Amino acid sequence: MQVFYGLLLMFILCSTIHLSEQWCSTCLDLACGASRECYDPCFKAFGRAHGKCMNNKCRCYT
């Protein structure tokens, strides 16, 4: 039973790390002050003009 809980814990940790890597795949290393500044760079990078300025960096929604 302890082996099961150990494997479950490892699975949860690996899933969390994998999800955090996916979140940053849509972040652009571009300084911004407003969301409208992210529309053109997001369109050029991902083909969709869906973006938002978060923590002074552009985050694109694909």
Swiss-Prot record:
Disulfide bonds join 24-27, 32-53, 38-58, 42-60. InterPro entries: Scorpion_toxin-like_sf, Scorpion_toxinS_K_inh. Pfam families: Toxin_2 (PF00451). Expressed by the venom gland. Gene3D superfamilies: Knottin, scorpion toxin-like. One of its GO terms (cellular component) is extracellular region. Residues 1-22 form the signal peptide. GO terms for molecular function: ion channel inhibitor activity; potassium channel regulator activity; toxin activity. Belongs to the short scorpion toxin superfamily. Potassium channel inhibitor family. Alpha-KTx 12 subfamily. The N-terminal C2-C5 disulfide bridge unique to this toxin does not appear to confer stability to the protein. Negative results: inhibits with a low efficiency Kv1.1/KCNA1, Kv1.5/KCNA5, Kv1.6/KCNA6, Kv4.3/KCND3, Kv7.1/KCNQ1, Kv7.2/KCNQ2, Kv7.4/KCNQ4, and ERG/KCNH2, and does not inhibit Kv1.4/KCNA4, Kv2.1/KCNB1, and Kv3.1/KCNC1. Potently blocks Kv1.3/KCNA3, Kv1.2/KCNA2, and Shaker potassium channels and inhibits high conductance calcium-activated potassium channels. Is potent against Kv1.3/KCNN3 (IC(50)=0.55 nM) and Kv1.2/KCNN2 (IC(50)=6.19 nM). It also stimulates the release of NO, IL-6 and TNF-alpha in J774.1 cells and presents a pro-inflammatory activity in mice. This is Potassium channel toxin alpha-KTx 12.1. It comes from Tityus serrulatus. The lineage of its organism: Eukaryota, Metazoa, Ecdysozoa, Arthropoda, Chelicerata.
